[in-house]
Amino acid sequence: MIKLRLKRFGKKREVSYRIVATNSTSRRDGLPLEELGFYNPRTNETRLDVPAIVRRLQQGAQPTETVRSILRKAQIFEQLKA
């Protein structure tokens, strides 16, 4: 099963995350299938590759709870329904 999850990057106490598509059995920071975006919780900055995310969701990828809330804020699910 393909999951959309956060991959941790950065130094101690200066964490940022990349939103990636990865196999559900692989490690959190393992090799992803595809990088789909970036999220920095300290500055609340988010950059998303919307067409790639919509394509992965249509293929059946399951987002984690945190990624789902980020996608909901960016209104990705409305684009998926259209």
UniProtKB/Swiss-Prot annotation:
Pfam families: Ribosomal_S16
Example of a GO MF term: structural constituent of ribosome
Keywords, comma-separated and alphabetical: Ribonucleoprotein, Ribosomal protein
GO cellular component, one term: small ribosomal subunit
UniProt KW Amino-acid biosynthesis keyword: no
Single GO biological process annotation from the record: translation
Sequence similarity: Belongs to the bacterial ribosomal protein bS16 family.
Name used for this protein in its record: Small ribosomal subunit protein bS16
Lineage of source species: Bacteria, Bacillati, Cyanobacteriota, Cyanophyceae, Synechococcales
Gene assigned in the entry: rpsP
